């Protein structure tokens, strides 16, 4: 199975899926002193995004009109580079997953130097993907996940990552059949 922030949306027919466990969204991070408070503030700005990310897919797809307002949309190999660019002023904003954004902002020396814009670029759900037709393994994993959600184990684990927004993003147990 594949299980590491694996987006199910758009791939529903490619795999056998568990129920979703995270409601994820793509957001924009800016410096707090940038004067950028919403998407309109991104007009004419230099925005970075990770190559092959959901944020890039959204900005090249459903949100291409938003991306067209940017001075440019630069792809980077990983978000550490993007944050160094944001810190140095080489870019004005970063489009990224909310969990990674929360992690990156909260791990900075001065987290208050950054803010995540309120509006999301797009949203998606994470689930565990299995080889198409492998319902036996999917059912075993799903049963365990459901038990963990029911007995509070999932919430206890998620609470360890509260600084990254994990508890609020959980949907496991809410969509169970």
Identify what each model region corresponds to.
Residues 1-41, 120:
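Acidic, polar ligand-binding/catalytic clefts
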Residues 3-14, 58-61, 85-88, 92-122:
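A ligand-binding cleft/hinge motif common to bilobed small-molecule-binding domains
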Residues 35-46, 172-177:
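Immediate post-signal peptide segment of exported/extracytoplasmic ligand-binding proteins
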Residues 34, 72-88, 124:
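Short helix-initiation/N-cap motifs at beta->coil->alpha
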Residues 54-74, 112-116, 145-177:
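Ligand-binding clefts/hinges and TM-proximal coupling segments of bilobed small-molecule sensing domains
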Residues 41-46, 51-54, 127-165:
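Extended ligand-binding regions for polar small-molecule ligands
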Residues 3, 25, 39, 56-60, ...:
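Extracytoplasmic/secreted envelope proteins and their assembly/folding machinery
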Residues 22-30, 98, 106-146, 164-177:
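Periplasmic-binding protein-like
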């Amino acid at each position: 199975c594949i299980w590491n922030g694996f987006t199910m949306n758009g791939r529903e027919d490619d795999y056998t899926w568990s129920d979703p466990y995270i409601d994820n969204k793509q957001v924009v991070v800016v410096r707090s002193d940038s004067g950028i408070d919403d998407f309109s503030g991104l007009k004419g700005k230099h925005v970075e995004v990770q190559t092959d990310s959901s944020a890039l897919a959204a900005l090249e797809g459903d949100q291409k009109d938003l991306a067209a307002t940017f001075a440019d949309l630069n792809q980077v190999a990983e978000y550490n580079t993007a944050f160094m660019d944001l810190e140095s002023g080489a870019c004005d904003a970063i489009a990224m997953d909310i969990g990674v954004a929360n992690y990156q902002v909260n791990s900075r020396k001065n987290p208050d130097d950054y803010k995540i814009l309120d509006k999301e670029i797009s949203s998606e759900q994470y689930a565990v993907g299995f080889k198409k037709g492998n319902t036996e393994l999917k059912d075993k994993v799903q049963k365990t996940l459901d038990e963990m959600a029911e007995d509070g184990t999932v919430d206890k684990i998620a609470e360890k990552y509260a600084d990254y927004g994990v508890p609020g993003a959980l949907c496991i147990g809410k969509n169970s059949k």
